[in-house]
Amino acid sequence: MSLTSIICGIALLTIGEVGPQNMPDTIEPVESPFVMPLFERPVFPESTILVRMEQEGISTKPIQEAIDSMSCRGGGTVVVPPGVWRTGRLILKSHVNLHLSEGAELHFSGNIIDYLPAVFTRDEGVELYSLGACLYADGQENIALTGKGKVVGPPTSCEIYKRNESMSSDKGIRKPLADRIYDGKNGEGVFLPKTFAPINCKNVFVEGVTFERGLYWNIVPQYCEHIVIRGLQ
């Protein structure tokens, strides 16, 4: 048997042992030599909003309005039905579960304007203001991204990627934080958005979703507490 065959066989075994198809319903306790919190699946209010797709253009507005409305009402689940949804940056809010139905695909825009205004984020350890993430949250509690749907990042042929070519987080490190704003205006470049990157959040839950084609890091919780990420592809 060739080395290539052995490597392929190991890869197939590994793929077959991970992902949502092999994910148990229960979250097992973490065994460690020190005290760990009990990780549990979050419980959201029973309220549900089913998002309606825009007939033309991108669907950022109806999805974001559903998230905002649900959070203001005390929380619940925002359901994205099957279909290809073109969208800009979405901001998750407290006590809301964004649920991607099987067959639902969020295809994120590659245009800078769809990620404005600039938001607080980090790039290579440097705090600054830029595009943030496709799925972003700041200072929220009890947020979730669940379901059997798919999150598809922008292509590398997009405007955002091209406007990042000369950017380095080192250029802003000597400026005060308030001056580290990179929103693409006045010919300025931008920092690439991560795919899922909450910051300063508590109780973050991600389960079952497939991530495909990201411009930068896919899943990057920053300054967050009590995070559960399981069964992803």
Question: Across the structure, where does each feature detected by a protein language model lie?
Answer:
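Metal-dependent enolase-superfamily TIM-barrel catalytic cores that perform enediolate-based chemistry
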Residues: 196, 209-211, 220-223, 231-233
